[in-house]
């Protein structure tokens, strides 16, 4: 069974040496988080990387959120 992230992220040694990229692009996932981390907006990222669709960026954020929530033990939740 395919996981949701399998349609979102591609890791292929033939594409940027296996760097995780948005599926259907050559845009590394790391670039997205670097943009957000430096205070750039989602729209600025999408403008500079037009092969990434807005829906892909939102799905990546949702996936990252789910991973973080899964990693936090229940006893640490206030």
Where do the language-model regions lie?
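A short, structured beta-strand/loop element
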Residues: 3-43
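Long, charge-rich, low-complexity alpha-helical segments
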Residues: 28-78
């Amino acid at each position: 069974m395919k996981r949701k992230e399998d349609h979102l992220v591609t890791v292929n040694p033939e594409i940027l040496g296996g760097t995780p990229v948005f599926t259907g692009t050559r845009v590394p996932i790391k670039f997205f988080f670097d943009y957000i981390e430096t205070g750039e907006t989602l729209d600025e990222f999408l403008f500079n990387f037009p092969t990434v669709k807005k829906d892909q960026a939102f799905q990546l954020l949702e996936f990252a959120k789910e991973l973080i929530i899964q990693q936090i033990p229940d006893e640490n939740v206030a």
